[in-house]
């Protein structure tokens, strides 16, 4: 906040000495500091040699003189220093026009601008640079800016102010006259009535009664006009009633003026009230519009949030669909893999099939060996023939043999399944199996060739004579000849 104090240009400055001016402010010289003698000397030559700062290019040329007459005063205590103190302090240098305090009041230090009436007082003021003002040394320098002054009064503005003042004076007079009016008005009316009746009686006595009856209205008007003239003459002669009547007229005029003014005031107040009501209505409409805008903004925000939620749900649904598609693809790939595996299994015979073939081949070999053993021992057949009555029928024997073969085949199948479900064996064991199978194949071929020779003898033995008890024991126990290696023993070893 800045404050402007007018100097010599606006208010009269007392012509007291600088010491008395400072003492009137209540500021001691010891607190302000010693004033250098060079500053008080009017014939200073050295101070005029201080160079002035260059001005900016955009400075108004009409303010150059003001800038040259202005001084910057800094390092002022914002709590104790006032514009009046600065004004009184710099009056000892020269005539001061304006003093403006500047800077923030809340800060500990402030600064000010002092404009002198004469440019010659500027170098004197510069001599105070470093002088103690209160508890701080002053910093004085040339100013780069002019003091911003209030606008000067134009003749039109002055005339408006005079009119307003005169209106106020007239209103005051009207109020005073209205207060005095009821007493003076009654007395004036009584005196006026008496004077009028006296003049009328004189005029009536001079004129005749019969002539009044015959006269026309026009003549009566002319007489009344003459009467008014005579009345004016009488009023001029008598000074006191004339003055009273003029006062009453002025009062009446003042009343009419006051009434007209009151009417004007009422109309103005009504107009102002209407304008205020319109402004209030506009403000209400604006507030409503603002509330509507806020509601629209809120609705827009809600719509955006809903759209975001919908988008999130759509993204989730898309992700779910993608997951489902992936699962379907995985299922399809699994199905295709299973189909391929099944096709491969259908192309390659299963191990159980090979095991069944092996079991069948082993049963065939056993049959062949039995037929060979029966052909080699013909003596036993004779004993069998003798004891045919005790042995059972050949049909029952064939059934028992079939059951035994089935049981053996079933056992061999179980063993092979157990082998297949167990851990896979090394490649060396598989090679060993293949070698064993290769070694057994020529034996099988030899036995097959012998089988064709022994079929005839076997058929004859089955028809002619039953088997011996030794053969029954061999079949029941499943033993093989000691000379040849049985496939069942090989399978057990494997």
From Swiss-Prot:
It comes from the Eukaryota. SUPFAM superfamilies: RNA-binding domain, RBD. GO terms for biological process: mRNA processing; RNA splicing. Residues 193-262, 357-373 have a biased composition (Basic residues). It is found in: Nucleus. The modification Phosphoserine is found at residues 174, 187. Belongs to the splicing factor SR family. This is Splicing regulatory glutamine/lysine-rich protein 1. The lineage of its organism: Eukaryota, Metazoa, Chordata, Craniata, Vertebrata. The gene is Srek1.
């Amino acid at each position: 906040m800045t404050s402007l104090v007018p100097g010599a240009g606006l208010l009269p400055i007392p012509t007291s000495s600088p010491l008395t001016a400072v003492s009137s402010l209540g500021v001691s010289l010891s607190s302000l500091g010693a004033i250098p003698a060079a500053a008080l000397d009017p014939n200073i030559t050295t101070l005029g040699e201080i160079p002035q700062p260059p001005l900016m290019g955009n400075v108004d040329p009409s303010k150059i003189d003001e800038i040259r007459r202005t001084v910057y005063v800094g390092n002022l205590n914002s709590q104790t220093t006032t514009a009046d103190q600065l004004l009184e302090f710099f009056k000892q240098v020269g005539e001061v026009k304006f003093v403006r305090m500047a800077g923030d009041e809340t800060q500990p230090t402030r600064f000010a601008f002092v404009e002198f009436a004469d440019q010659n007082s500027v170098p004197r003021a510069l001599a105070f640079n470093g002088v103690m003002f209160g508890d701080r040394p002053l910093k004085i320098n040339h100013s780069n800016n002019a003091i911003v002054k209030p606008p000067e009064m134009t003749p039109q503005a002055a005339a408006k102010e005079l009119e307003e003042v005169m209106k106020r004076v007239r209103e005051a007079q009207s109020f005073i006259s209205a207060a005095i009016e009821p007493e003076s008005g009654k007395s004036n009316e009584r005196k006026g009535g008496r004077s009028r009746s006296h003049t009328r009686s004189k005029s009536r006595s001079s004129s005749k009664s019969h002539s009044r009856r015959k006269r026309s209205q026009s003549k009566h008007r002319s007489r009344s006009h003459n009467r008014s003239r005579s009345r004016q003459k009488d009023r001029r002669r008598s000074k006191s009633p004339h003055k009273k009547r003029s006062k009453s007229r002025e009062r009446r005029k003042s009343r009419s003026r006051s009434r007209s003014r009151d009417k004007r005031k009422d109309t103005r107040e009504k107009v102002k009230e209407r304008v205020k009501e319109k402004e209030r209505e506009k403000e209400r409409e604006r507030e409503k519009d603002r509330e509507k805008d806020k509601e629209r903004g809120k609705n827009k925000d809600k719509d955006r949030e809903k759209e975001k939620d919908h988008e999130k749900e759509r993204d989730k649904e898309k992700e779910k669909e993608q997951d489902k598609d992936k699962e379907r693809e995985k299922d399809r790939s699994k199905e295709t893999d299973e189909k391929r595996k099944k096709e491969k299994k259908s192309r390659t015979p299963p191990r159980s099939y090979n095991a069944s073939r092996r079991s069948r081949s082993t049963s065939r070999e056993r049959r062949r060996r039995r037929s060979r053993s029966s052909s080699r021992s013909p003596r036993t057949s004779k004993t069998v023939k003798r004891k045919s009555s005790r042995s059972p029928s050949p049909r029952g024997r064939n059934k028992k043999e079939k059951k035994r073969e089935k049981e053996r085949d079933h056992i061999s199948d179980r063993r092979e399944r157990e082998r297949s479900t167990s851990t896979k064996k090394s490649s060396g064991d598989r090679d060993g199996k293949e070698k064993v199978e290769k070694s057994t194949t020529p034996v099988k071929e030899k036995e097959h060739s012998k089988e064709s020779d022994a079929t005839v003898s076997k058929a004859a033995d089955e028809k002619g004579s039953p088997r011996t008890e030794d053969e029954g024991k061999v079949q029941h126990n499943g033993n093989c000849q000691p000379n040849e290696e049985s496939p069942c023993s090989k399978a057990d070893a494997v």
